[in-house]
């Protein structure tokens, strides 16, 4: 490596010597996902070959109701009868947030929805239009995220510009709506 100090301009060869792996606090790490599935296997006796299906099913269910600890899940995991999605979600909270878990599987959820032609359940209620309905889930930011798990065959298709814009707009509206009560209370004190 020709670069000898942090202030020496690096060559492209020097830069290529760095083997960087993307990580962020907004997406669960592979180690956190492994810890979650280990907890599930031990607690609920879920066979190893079913664990990926349980992850995908749970993340897909959160796409319908929102990826929050306050979200209400119903039913058993489609991967294993007798184990409720609610039980699986509780075990996630030991290792990371629900949103971080879902962000890790966003690309998988995206492909599931496109393949089954089934958008998130609340897309219309959230104000998404027909052409952007598949972006109507709150962890859509995980689609194409470098720290999210990518399907072996890639995405069925990437998000369209309309889907990206619709999600960004919905996100800003939600942030404004969530901030309004605080702003409103401050104004009442004036």
Curated annotation (Swiss-Prot):
PROSITE patterns named among the record's database cross-references: POTEX_CARLAVIRUS_COAT
Keywords of the record: Capsid protein, Helical capsid protein, Ribonucleoprotein, Virion
Protein location: Virion
Protein name stated in the entry: Coat protein
Family membership noted in the UniProt record: Belongs to the potexvirus capsid protein family.
Superkingdom to which the source organism belongs: Viruses
Pfam hit, one: Flexi_CP
One term under GO cellular component: ribonucleoprotein complex
A molecular-function term among this protein's GO annotations: structural molecule activity
Function: Required for genome encapsidation. Forms ribonucleoprotein complexes along with TGB1 helicase and viral RNA.
